[in-house]
A protein has these predicted regions:
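Structural detector for short beta-strands of small beta-barrel domains
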Residues: 3, 13-44
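Beta-strand/loop nucleic-acid-binding surfaces
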Residues: 52-67
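Negatively charged, low-complexity tracts enriched in Asp/Glu with abundant Ser/Thr
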Residues: 11-27, 118-184
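Polybasic, proline/glycine-rich intrinsically disordered low-complexity segments
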Residues: 212-251
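Intrinsically disordered, low-complexity regulatory segments enriched in Ser/Thr/Pro
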Residues: 77, 186-220
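Preference for solvent-exposed, low-hydrophobicity sequence contexts
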Residues: 1-15, 66, 93
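SH3/SH3-like beta-barrel fold
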Residues: 47-51
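Flexible glycine-rich surface loops and low-complexity tracts that mediate binding to linear polymers
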Residues: 69-91
Length: 252
């Protein structure tokens, strides 16, 4: 970065984006914000972007979606966990409260280190289905940064359905959550079913109403691994780079 820092500056800051989760000084995983800057150098492995007077970002070249010229102004969007509505998962949750005289007001809540992605389904009656929802929302994905529901968001999960049986019908009609996904690894219908007799889960993949694959005897702590293998194409790790000026050289 020599030549890009003012002569009266004694130190500089740099931030490395290499696909590894960012951790705050308090030890929480954090989602980086998009930023703009100027490309000042490229190597076989990295792109260096000047983002401030003495601040720089280093991007893993293998992860960027576009490799611009040196000197180009760019907007960089590292991966951030998202909710099913497309909003960042660290967006404060809003709710409407009422004063003693009935006047409404808006409350924003943000828990440090929290980035939930709640399933867009109503609260079920079946306890086993409630537990499955809790596990999908709270258990980590294999990468250790996302929850399983973030993995579903990144795979394009939508059109959710549930099977919410009464206690006496739990074996005949197993509790289940179904959804469609559209990733490079799989496009079709995914169903996660609870198997009461084994106290385990099964995961089914359907395409055009035909069963493509079924994985049986999945324990709760293996759900993330099973879903990652079946539907996660890994594209969520990419660092999106958009040129605001300059000539495009390479596009992945």
């Amino acid at each position: 970065v020599r030549g890009h820092v003012p002569s009266n500056v004694r130190s500089f800051k740099f931030n490395i984006f290499d696909g590894q989760p960012k951790v705050s000084t308090l030890g929480f995983h954090v989602d980086p914000k998009p930023f703009e800057g100027k490309v000042i150098a490229t190597t076989d492995e990295a792109i260096v972007v000047k983002t401030g007077r003495a601040e720089f970002a280093v991007l893993d070249k293998a992860l960027v979606t576009d490799v611009p010229d040196e000197g180009a102004k760019v907007q960089v969007e590292p991966y951030a966990r998202r909710r099913f509505d497309g909003m960042r998962a660290d967006t404060p949750e809003e709710s409407t409260e009422f004063t003693a005289d009935g006047q409404p007001y808006t409350v924003k809540r943000l828990i440090l280190g929290s980035a939930p992605a709640k399933l867009p389904i109503p609260e079920p009656q079946c306890p086993e289905l409630q537990e499955l929802i809790h596990q999908l929302e709270q258990l980590p994905a294999p990468d250790g940064f996302r929850r399983i529901t973030h993995l579903l968001v990144d795979a394009g999960a939508r059109d959710f359905t549930v099977v919410d049986p009464s206690p006496r019908n739990i074996i005949a009609t197993p509790p289940a959550i179904g959804f469609t996904v559209a990733s490079a690894k799989f496009q079709g219908r995914v169903t996660v079913l609870y198997e009461r007799g084994l106290d385990l889960y099964a995961v089914e993949l359907h395409r055009n109403s035909n069963l493509v694959e079924r994985v049986d005897e999945v324990s709760f702590d293996e759900l993330g691994q099973a879903l990652e293998r079946l539907i996660d194409d890994g594209s969520w790790r990419l660092i999106r780079v958009q040129r605001l000026s300059g000539r495009k050289l390479v596009q992945h």
